[in-house]
């Protein structure tokens, strides 16, 4: 039951109706019997600055930030976590008691925690990683891998200028060697890889499949996709058919929500099969 003392958080985006975050946080609120609510907040780009400035006055505990606002929100924060600064985007905002806005980015955290939960024997230091894509998701994934001890990275992207910009941003704080490759060169980058990550939208419902020959991967390699609709993307299906270990992208969404929920509602939530089923809409 929600009372007049309820703590309220939400997700800001444009559009925001597709977000599964309300289902995720709603599950945790119900599980822990918390007097609180989590609501979708549709905020157009031109209204973002006003919306963020109003959060403390409205008494919100904080918000998640989704497309297209993650990078634009960064400049509107009063303080940033180190990982948000390194990634250059914000996906979690905490309204502090003094009215200041603290910006965080938990996407990389969610990515790593998903791998650790689904494949407990996996370690970032096991070997080089190949990351497909060079957008905002790739930036969070790469930063988290470097922080966790990945010994080398290869960025595969059609737009080499964008890949180069990402590599330079990462090199500003990490000494780990980073190699660039085009899509045509991608199969040749797989031989020594311990991890292959797709951060593009290829394979998502309504998008073309990701066409990549995976036979160059070592039998011990792990393949993961941040796409979770469908849960098993064509990339993961191809990897599984080759006998490779795979991890779907749903857990990244679930785990990235944990730090924000704990900051807003004072409870450290768990990610388990019941939560996965609830977010997927399964009975």
Curated annotation (Swiss-Prot):
Keywords: Amino-acid biosynthesis, Aromatic amino acid biosynthesis, NADP, Oxidoreductase. Pathway: Metabolic intermediate biosynthesis; chorismate biosynthesis; chorismate from D-erythrose 4-phosphate and phosphoenolpyruvate: step 4/7. Shikimate binds at residues 19-21, 66, 91, 107, 228. One of its GO terms (biological process) is shikimate metabolic process. Homodimer. Its EC number is 1.1.1.25. HAMAP family: Shikimate_DH_AroE (MF_00222). NCBIfam families: aroE, PRK00258.1-4. It holds the Pfam family Shikimate_DH. Belongs to the shikimate dehydrogenase family. The keyword Oxidoreductase applies. The active site is at 70 (proton acceptor). It catalyses: shikimate + NADP(+) = 3-dehydroshikimate + NADPH + H(+). One of its GO terms (cellular component) is cytosol. The gene is aroE. GO terms for molecular function: NADP binding; shikimate 3-dehydrogenase (NADP+) activity. The keyword Nucleus does not apply. Involved in the biosynthesis of the chorismate, which leads to the biosynthesis of aromatic amino acids. Catalyzes the reversible NADPH linked reduction of 3-dehydroshikimate (DHSA) to yield shikimate (SA). NADP(+) binds at residues 82, 133-137, 226, 249. This is Shikimate dehydrogenase (NADP(+)).
């Amino acid at each position: 039951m929600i009372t007049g003392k309820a703590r309220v958080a939400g997700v800001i985006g444009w559009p925001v109706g597709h977000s599964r975050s309300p289902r995720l946080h709603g599950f945790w609120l119900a599980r822990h019997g918390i007097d609180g609510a989590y609501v979708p907040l549709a905020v157009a780009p031109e209204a973002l600055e006003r919306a963020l400035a109003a959060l403390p006055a409205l008494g919100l505990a904080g918000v998640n930030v989704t497309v297209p606002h993650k990078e634009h929100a960064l400049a509107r924060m009063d303080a940033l976590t180190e990982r948000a600064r390194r990634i250059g985007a914000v996906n979690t905002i905490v309204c502090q008691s003094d009215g200041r806005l603290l910006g965080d980015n938990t996407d990389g955290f969610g990515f790593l925690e998903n791998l650790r939960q689904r494949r407990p024997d996996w370690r970032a230091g096991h070997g080089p990683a190949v990351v497909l894509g060079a957008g905002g998701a790739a930036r969070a994934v790469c930063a988290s891998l470097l922080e966790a001890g990945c010994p080398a990275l290869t960025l595969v992207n059609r737009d080499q200028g964008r890949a180069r910009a990402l590599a330079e941003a990462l090199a500003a704080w990490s000494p780990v060697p980073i190699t660039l490759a085009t899509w045509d060169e991608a199969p040749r980058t797989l031989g020594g890889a311990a991890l292959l990550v797709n951060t593009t939208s290829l394979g998502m419902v309504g998008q073309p499949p990701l066409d990549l020959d995976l036979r160059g991967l070592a039998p011990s390699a792990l393949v993961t996709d941040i796409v979770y609709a469908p849960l098993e993307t064509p990339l993961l299906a191809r990897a599984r058919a080759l006998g490779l270990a795979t991890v779907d992208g749903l857990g990244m969404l679930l785990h990235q929500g944990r730090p924000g929920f704990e900051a807003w509602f004072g409870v450290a939530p768990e990610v388990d099969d019941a939560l996965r089923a609830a977010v997927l809409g399964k009975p």
